[in-house]
């Protein structure tokens, strides 16, 4: 076989491989797009249900009316009037593994009634323990500035997760300050 025939055969085979790879990639992309389109509403609904459950967990009320937050704290995502019981504040402080999305209940006296972690990407077995009841219970009844013991406060930091503990403490402080700004 001549050198020209070998080169032409090799080029044809390469073109065939490229076209095949492109077709497989296009089919996979199309399938992923279809799955995303089918599940996007379910995912949004599940996230909304999780957020509503977090509101009820930190401060029970018949309704949660959104308020306009005009403060400068960028960790405050939303503030809700929880009927006559007080307020629920969604905050996103920055933890070790990224933002920690959490709800903080605040009564009419400016006291934390509870916290609920909605979403986080903290290290499993360390920072992820911030969602455990024992850690979250420390914040109930706190007002003013909340800090871990290492920073002069009275919140016991999670072992090996001081950054996460500080982030949650800062989130609670931000929520308390946001409610105080409302008057």
Q: Model-derived features: where do they sit?
A:
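Flexible, solvent-exposed loop/hinge segments and secondary-structure transition points
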Residues: 2-183
């Amino acid at each position: 076989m001549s050198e020209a025939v070998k080169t032409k055969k090799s080029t044809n085979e390469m073109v065939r491989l490229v076209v095949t790879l492109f077709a497989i990639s296009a089919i996979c992309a199309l399938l992923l797009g279809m799955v995303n389109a089918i599940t996007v509403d379910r995912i949004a609904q599940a996230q909304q249900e999780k957020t509503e459950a977090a509101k009820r967990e930190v401060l029970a009320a018949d309704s949660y009316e959104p308020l306009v937050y005009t403060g400068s704290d960028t960790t405050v995502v939303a503030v809700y009037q929880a009927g006559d019981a007080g307020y629920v504040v969604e905050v996103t402080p920055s933890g070790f593994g990224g933002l920690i999305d959490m709800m903080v209940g605040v009564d009419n006296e400016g006291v934390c009634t509870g916290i609920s972690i909605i979403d986080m990407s903290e290290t499993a077995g360390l920072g992820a323990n911030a969602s455990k009841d024992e850690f979250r219970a420390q914040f109930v009844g706190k007002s003013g500035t909340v800090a871990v013991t290492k920073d002069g406060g009275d919140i016991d930091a999670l072992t090996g997760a001081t950054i996460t503990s500080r982030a949650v403490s800062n989130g609670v402080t931000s929520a308390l300050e946001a409610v105080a700004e409302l008057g």
